[in-house]
């Protein structure tokens, strides 16, 4: 893979100038293409992006770093990571349906085709052994039926879903809230390597980007977008990453199933937000029937 001029400019806007996906998308719409953004005056770009003085200074700095950023992209590629911009044909089509698709995604492994059925298995990272065992069973059962299991590599339910899929020889996709140099949690590094070989790791953050709570929550939109349905094995709190995934699924018209719903505040909120309660015994036919 070679580093294109368009990729370098988009990398400069996202990583150098720290512009978010909606802002960069608006600039692409207004100017037409990355080169036109770069050729425009700083004041014009800053006005269209509604940048503060500090943001404008970052933009000016980023514009002077194109050679260095090109070299950084080349090193990223040499490390085994594939950066794909939203302008690339190989960019995951499912992500294009988001209202705020990542401008660049970084991939290790191979993202399954959009035509391959995929289901997200998500839930609390506070899960007990029984909850994790249920997640493993869901992941394994989906993989045995040729379904890709998507999750977020977190402790608890996420890790269980990935583990089950891999144990069955299936494919799994992990969406990270950090760059690949900062796999989290650290104890899932081996699991991440296995996922890379039997599916894909994907993130919207460059390799050195650290994990933050907001990035963990924000990545849920990608987990949902890459899936045809969402199975929530455990929900711990009404204001959590899992609940954000439920809301994202509702907004993207993805069916959501809540395993073993009870009378807890979190379960009640999940159902109110559109999750369908189902029993603890995995019912794969129910989830896959209308996909």
Spans of model-derived segments:
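Short, small/acidic-rich helices and loops at N termini and domain boundaries
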Residues: 1-87
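Glycine-biased, small-residue-rich flexible motifs in mid-sequence functional cores and linkers
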Residues: 1-6, 85-291
């Amino acid at each position: 893979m070679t580093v294109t001029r368009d990729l370098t400019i988009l990398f400069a806007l996202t990583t150098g100038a720290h512009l978010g996906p909606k802002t960069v998308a608006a600039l692409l719409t207004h100017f037409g293409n990355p080169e036109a953004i770069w050729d425009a005056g700083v004041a014009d770009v800053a006005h269209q992006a509604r940048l503060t003085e500090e943001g404008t200074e970052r933009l000016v700095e980023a514009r002077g770093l194109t050679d260095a950023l090109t070299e950084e992209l080349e090193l990223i590629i040499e490390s085994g990571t594939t950066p794909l911009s939203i302008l690339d044909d190989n960019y995951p089509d499912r992500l294009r349906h988001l209202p705020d698709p990542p401008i660049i995604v970084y991939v290790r492994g191979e993202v399954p085709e959009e035509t391959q059925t995929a289901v997200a298995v998500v839930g609390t990272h506070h899960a007990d052994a029984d909850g994790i065992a249920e997640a493993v069973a869901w992941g394994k059962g989906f993989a045995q039926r040729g379904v890709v299991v998507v999750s977020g590599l977190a402790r608890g339910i996420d890790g269980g879903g990935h583990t089950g899929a891999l144990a069955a020889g299936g494919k799994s996709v992990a969406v990270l809230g950090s760059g690949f140099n900062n796999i989290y949690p650290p104890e899932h590094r081996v699991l991440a390597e296995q996922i890379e070989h039997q599916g894909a790791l994907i993130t919207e953050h460059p390799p050195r980007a650290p994990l933050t709570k907001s990035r963990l929550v924000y990545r849920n939109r990608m987990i949902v977008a890459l899936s045809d349905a969402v199975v929530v094995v455990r929900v711990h709190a009404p204001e959590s990453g899992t609940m954000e995934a439920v809301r994202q699924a509702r907004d993207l018209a993805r069916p959501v199933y809540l395993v073993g719903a009870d009378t807890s505040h979190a379960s009640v909120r999940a159902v109110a937000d559109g999750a369908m309660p189902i029993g603890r015994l995995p019912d794969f036919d129910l989830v896959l029937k209308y996909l």
